[in-house]
C-alpha cells in the first residue's frame, strides 16, 4: 500500500456526529490503513472532501465503490498504473471497479482542499489556463463512455460519473 496526495490539501478532519474536528496528527491515516488491511478486495481508499459532508447532514462512516479523489491509499497489488494526463485518480478507480475491485471513500475522515484552478502551480498554468477544465473532462469521458459524460458543474465544464453499476 502507498499514499498519493494532491499538493493543494489544506487540512484533514475527523467527521463524527455531524461535527468536524481538524486532525493535527497522522491518526486518520493510521485508521484508514488499518481498515483496508482487513480486506483483500480493496483497490483504493481515501477521505471524502469536507465540502461534500456538511455538518447539517448525517453520513455513514464510509461509502463503497465510488470515487477516490486527491488523497489515495492505493493497493500495490492492483495491476493498474497511472494513465492519461488528467483525472488519473478517477480513471484508476473506474478501471479497478470495472474489474471487480472495491473502493472505500471515508466520511469519518475528510480532506479540505482548494478547488481546481484556484491555486497557482500544479496543473493550473500548464493545463487549465487556456482551455479551463474541458479537455480534462473530455478525456475521462472518452476513456469511460459507458459511465461518464460531460456536464456543467461549479460554473465550468466537468465530468459526471455514474457509479451505480458498481453498487
Regions found by a protein language model. Name each.
Residues 2-5, 43-48, 103-106, 149-151:
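A structural signal for short, well-ordered beta-strand segments and their strand-loop junctions
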Residues 3, 9-95:
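Conserved catalytic core of nucleotide-sugar-dependent glycosyltransferases
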Residues 84-86, 90-167:
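C-terminal catalytic/acceptor-binding lobe
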Amino acid at each position: 500500500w502507498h499514499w498519493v496526495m494532491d499538493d493543494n490539501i489544506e487540512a484533514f478532519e475527523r467527521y463524527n456526529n455531524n461535527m468536524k474536528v481538524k486532525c493535527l496528527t497522522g491518526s486518520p491515516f493510521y485508521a484508514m490503513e488499518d481498515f483496508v488491511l482487513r480486506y483483500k478486495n480493496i483497490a483504493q481508499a481515501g477521505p471524502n472532501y469536507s465540502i461534500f459532508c456538511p455538518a447539517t447532514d448525517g453520513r455513514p462512516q464510509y461509502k463503497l465503490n465510488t470515487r477516490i479523489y486527491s488523497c489515495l491509499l492505493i493497493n500495490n497489488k492492483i495491476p493498474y498504473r497511472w494513465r492519461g494526463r488528467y483525472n488519473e485518480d478517477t480513471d484508476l478507480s473506474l478501471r479497478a471497479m470495472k474489474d471487480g475491485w472495491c473502493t472505500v471513500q471515508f466520511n469519518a475522515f475528510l480532506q479540505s482542499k482548494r478547488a481546481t484552478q484556484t491555486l497557482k502551480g500544479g496543473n493550473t498554468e500548464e493545463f487549465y489556463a487556456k482551455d479551463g477544465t474541458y479537455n480534462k473532462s473530455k478525456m475521462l469521458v472518452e476513456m469511460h463512455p459507458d459511465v461518464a459524460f460531460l456536464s456543467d458543474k461549479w460554473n465550468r465544464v466537468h465530468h459526471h460519473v455514474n457509479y451505480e453499476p458498481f453498487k
